Amino acid sequence: MEVHIGLGGVYKQPPGKMIRGAFENLFLSVREALQGERRSAASLDTSSPISACVHPHPTWNEPSTWTEVRGTPWREPQGAQPDPPPCSPRSQAPQFTLSSCTTELKEILGEQGGMPEEGNSESASKEGYPESISDSAKEICKAVSVSLGLSMEALEHLSAAGEWQRGDCMFAGPPHHTMGAQTCQVAEEDKSDTSFSQYREGAFRRAGQSTYSAGKAPEDGSSLPTEDKEQPCTDMALSEPGSLRSRGMEVMPSLTLYKPTAFMEDASAYPGRDYYSFQMALAPHGRIKVESPIEFAGSAWGGPSRYSEFPGFSHCGPSANWHSLFEEGQATASYTDSSLYSYPRSHVPAGPDGEFSAEAWYPATAMLGRVHMAVPMRPRMTHGWTATLGIRRRLGWTGVESTFYPIDYYFPPQKPCLSCEDEASGCHYEALTCGSCKVFFKRAAEGNQKYLCASRNDCTIDKFRRKNCPSCRLRKCYEAGMTLGARKLKKLGNLKAQEELEGSPGQSEGREMPPNMSIPQLEGYSCQPIFLNVLEAIEPMVVCSGHDNNQPDSFALLLSSLNELGERQLVHVVKWAKALPGFRNLHVNDQMTVIQYSWMGLMIFAMGWRSFKNVNSRMLYFAPDLVFNEYRMHKSRMYSQCVRMRHLSQEFGWLQVTPEEFLCDEGPSALSIIPVEGLKDQKCFDELRMNYIKELDRVISCKRNNPASSSPRFFNLPKLLGSVQPIDVNLVQFTFGLFGKAQMVSVDFPEMMSEIISVQVPKILSGRVKPLYFHSS
């Protein structure tokens, strides 16, 4: 909606060119103020009583007259008035004199020869186009405008218009009152030319002191007689409801350029004044057109394409109440008259009843349509609007920031699958995985299938290569924490037991199995395959040390390679422990403590198994690229420790340990050393350790056909774990001594190994930890 605002009122017709920018409004205001001053002085005739009360009103085509009658309210003109109302002596004096101009305007008029003269004003009035500014002043204004890159074409259309001057705001509409004037009187408007209908405009004139102060109403609420009513200057003078004289101004967001008046500078002059109850006089530009609903979102006025929800507002737009800030006795008026905002647009023809269509008020409705929003939508938060939106919420602006959102607003980013890094579809088998890994794990875990990796158990498992190696994929599923629940295991065990019984009907008919013998065997048979599949899947992969076998063996080279191998294996040990069934039920601090104290024993136990499987316990198989023979054992200066480790590897062969028994022994070996003072959740630790011992017993019972032979084996296998503890303490002591003279012997220690050796090994050597044995002897 377009409203053409000048310093003297609302213009009837639009100018030839839209004025934009703060500098153009500034020069326009100064120029029109000078024109209005000269025009008011030129149009006065002291000999006529009418000329003392009638003043030209600035319009775009035809100047209208402004009249003032003291003590007379607003009235609609009934045509041409033969006799004007009498004017008071105060109103007969010229309303615009040089004293009403500011000091700057006086200096411009005095220096540039712009003072009005009687002869010039009369000739200018007769020609109908008065002289606006002197030639030198014109040249100055034009030169400044050209230097600032502004156009002077818009100023040429206003050469015949006289305007008021506002003192407290640089760009503003007509003033309501000043400190000296407390009331405004508006008289009827006389038009001699009735050949075509034009919209009439009201006027503001200075008057004397009124009975009531500005902005106040009678306390008892009684109405005054028509002759004694006065229009307060707090807001724009309003006409009666339904009249064409009622109008409003749509205040758009503009530059808040405020020029304080002289009375504001002295705060001590008014000690009782409330400086927080006044509205800020924010003036708009000369002509502003805003159609974006974002500017009005959430405010009391609504958007320009919808009506306000507050009563008393016929359309969106704030009240055009201009105030001289912080004036004594000033109050903010509330408008309840719907005709306040029913002013017409001069360039759009009205309907037959004087009403204007929606297209006249909202020219963009045909393209955008009406916006009906009963409930505020959620604003789209951006980096630049965060602080601004917070301020708007504090001010009560909680509406729509933007009605369009990016596509990722409605579809938040998905979390990746912990197994193949695809988009996870939910929590399956106690882990956040995708649907493909869910189906794969169900088939692999319940089907008791044996998968073998064609590589080194280190295949890359992602969205595109997850089907290449099922063995590594299943291992990664177990590492992610996927596990079959207890109910699932029990159900699966019952089904397999039923199939086993149905498979041999003749045997079951021939002889009955004792109940005390059948239940342990069924439970052991049903539960062990699934549990062993989990342990097999999470088994740490074989890691290479990076040792260069082409170089001659030396103490520093062999020990540095062993330390590097320990660093790499430690990473896999941590991953294996976290994937160990039941290990995450421990307290977080207990998990770290167990790993830091048992990492050396786990590596010794695993190295003994690899030596037994790969080289038949003849050598120490630390890694595929690092195998210790007799020569390297002597060269490393740790021959006694190597002999003990080789003896441990030989015990695997003497006992004929199976891979399933080794997997079940590996869990208890991680839970074989704790601090002397105990753990934070010692009860949970003891339950977890006892469960692994029971699982080892079930594996032994399941693999041995003769139950009588299971007891000696169950005694020997845990004893194998007990033989790891002396080797662990001896090797830790050797490592700590080597760490103290590492720089002297040129042996490299990786960062993680250095931290553990310097912090945890002294606790082990000082007796602050205790090993847990399965047997007393």
From Swiss-Prot:
Q: State the residue spans of region: Modulating.
A: 1-416
Per the database record, which ranges form the NR LBD domain? Answer: 526-757
Enumerate the residues marked as the site Interaction with coactivator FXXLF motif.
Answer: E755
Location comes to:
Nucleus; Cytoplasm
Which positions does the site annotation Interaction with coactivator LXXL motif cover? K578
Q: In which tissues is it expressed?
A: Detected in somatic Leydig and Sertoli cells in testis with high level expression. Also detected at lower expression levels in forebrain and heart.
Disulfide bond residue pairs: none
Entry keywords, A to Z: Cytoplasm, DNA-binding, Lipid-binding, Metal-binding, Nucleus, Receptor, Steroid-binding, Transcription, Transcription regulation, Zinc, Zinc-finger
Zinc finger feature spans (NR C4-type): 417-434, 453-472
Give the InterPro entries listed for this entry: Andrgn_rcpt (IPR001103), NHR-like_dom_sf (IPR035500), Nucl_hrmn_rcpt_lig-bd (IPR000536), Nuclear_hormone_rcpt_NR3 (IPR050200), Znf_hrmn_rcpt (IPR001628), Znf_NHR/GATA (IPR013088)
Q: Which Gene3D superfamilies does the UniProt record give?
A: Erythroid Transcription Factor GATA-1, subunit A (3.30.50.10), Retinoid X Receptor (1.10.565.10)
Q: Where is this region: Disordered?
A: 53-95, 110-132, 205-241
**Record GO biological process:** androgen receptor signaling pathway; regulation of DNA-templated transcription
- Tell me which Pfam families the record gives: Androgen_recep (PF02166), Hormone_recep (PF00104), zf-C4 (PF00105)
**Presence of keyword Cell inner membrane:** no
UniProt GO molecular function: androgen binding; DNA-binding transcription factor activity; nuclear androgen receptor binding; nuclear receptor activity; sequence-specific DNA binding; steroid binding; zinc ion binding
One GO cellular component assignment for this chain's record is: nucleus
Record's domain comment?
Composed of three domains: a modulating N-terminal domain, a DNA-binding domain and a C-terminal ligand-binding domain. In the presence of bound steroid the ligand-binding domain interacts with the N-terminal modulating domain, and thereby activates AR transcription factor activity. Agonist binding is required for dimerization and binding to target DNA.
- Subunit-structure text: Binds DNA as a homodimer. Interacts via the ligand-binding domain with LXXLL and FXXLF motifs from coactivator proteins. Interacts (via ligand-binding domain) with TRIM68.
| Family (UniProt) | Belongs to the nuclear hormone receptor family. NR3 subfamily.
Q: What is the role of this chain?
A: Steroid hormone receptors are ligand-activated transcription factors that regulate eukaryotic gene expression and affect cellular proliferation and differentiation in target tissues. Transcription factor activity is modulated by bound coactivator and corepressor proteins.
Q: Name the chain's protein.
A: Androgen receptor
- Organism encoding this protein: Aquarana catesbeiana (American bullfrog)
- Gene behind this protein: ar
